[in-house]
């Protein structure tokens, strides 16, 4: 049982790290010339000063939805980890981790929705930027976090507390 708890906790922490990096780092979209766009700032690489020059992102409604969903996924994932720890120490033997599992499933749905909106509406979100480029690693991390959170939620729902 302790190995299972260790694996489930490690999976949850991995999902949290993936979500933090995906939400806060600066590479949801990469353009030629080392320009990097994220959910919060548009950053360009200044070759003479060798620094990043960043400005606020557009006021696009779809981007605001992606921002809100990614922040919501982080909050839900943190909440589900806290719930798991509380349930682990207060729940009676034989109980199921329904609340934790439901929270993780909602995390998965929020990440899925945010990444899907960004993928579908990328042209609208990036309208003021030159064409070309590709999705960055933060976008990929969000898609990796989605199935992991889904599997984690299912595991929590089926997990019983034992001694």
Swiss-Prot record:
InterPro entries: EMP_3, PMP-22/EMP/MP20-like, PMP22/EMP/MP20/Claudin, PMP22_EMP_MP20. Pfam families: PMP22_Claudin. Keywords: Glycoprotein, Membrane, Transmembrane, Transmembrane helix. One of its GO terms (cellular component) is plasma membrane. Its main location: membrane. One of its GO terms (biological process) is apoptotic process. It is a multi-pass membrane protein. Signal peptide: none annotated. It is found in: Membrane. Glycans are attached at residues 46, 56. The chain crosses the membrane at residues 4-24, 66-86, 100-120, 139-159. Probably involved in cell proliferation and cell-cell interactions. Belongs to the PMP-22/EMP/MP20 family. This is Epithelial membrane protein 3. It comes from Rattus norvegicus. The lineage of its organism: Eukaryota, Metazoa, Chordata, Craniata, Vertebrata.
